[in-house]
Amino acid sequence: VLTYDYRGIGLSKPSKMRGFKASMRIWGTQDYKALSEYIMTNFKNHHKFCLGHSVGALILGMNEDSQIFEKFVFVGTQDAFIGHLPLSVRPMALLGFGIAVPVTSSLLGYFPAHWFGLGESLPKGSAYDWRKLILNRKSTGKLFAQIEKDHSKSLHQEALVIYAERS
């Protein structure tokens, strides 16, 4: 089992977040790419499976090397467009991603997600990508349109998807 941090998150978080350059697109095209290259180099003869949570599953389509995995397990990942959220949650999502993300990110140079009970702080670019996923009807498609190539359409492995039922 291998785990890793994206730049700007966990142990890869810089001491100063203001102005730190990272985005979900960089996580998928560079950070995840580095991991997949490491796996291909060091574990050539092993069976390979991938467990991706949230953005960890979404970014698989940003890297052609995702083909190395026999099967996937996706946990809590989805087309995150606000229109797919329960009506009771939409106003909070609109306030958070429509106002809080751009205002706090512009003022602080990063998004203090922990202030809002949303986990650890995010680099500004990652917060704006998250905002894009929530506020745009095309959601993931809108994000993938900003990378060199969308590899998600070539992924045909069996996948177990674990999600919470809407109530």
Regions found by a protein language model. Name each.
Residues 155, 161-163:
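Short beta-strand/loop motif that positions the catalytic acidic residue
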Residues 51, 55-138:
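Alpha/beta-hydrolase-fold enzymes
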Residues 13-18, 85:
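Conserved catalytic-core motifs of eukaryotic protein kinase domains, centered on the activation segment
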Residues 45-47, 70, 157-158:
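Short coil/turn segments at beta-strand junctions that form active-site/ligand-binding loops
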Residues 165-167:
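Acidic catalytic loop of the alpha/beta-hydrolase fold
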Residues 133-151:
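Active-site nucleophile elbow and catalytic-triad environment of alpha/beta-hydrolase enzymes
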Residues 1-15:
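Conserved alpha/beta-hydrolase
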Residues 21-40:
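Alpha/beta-hydrolase active-site loop
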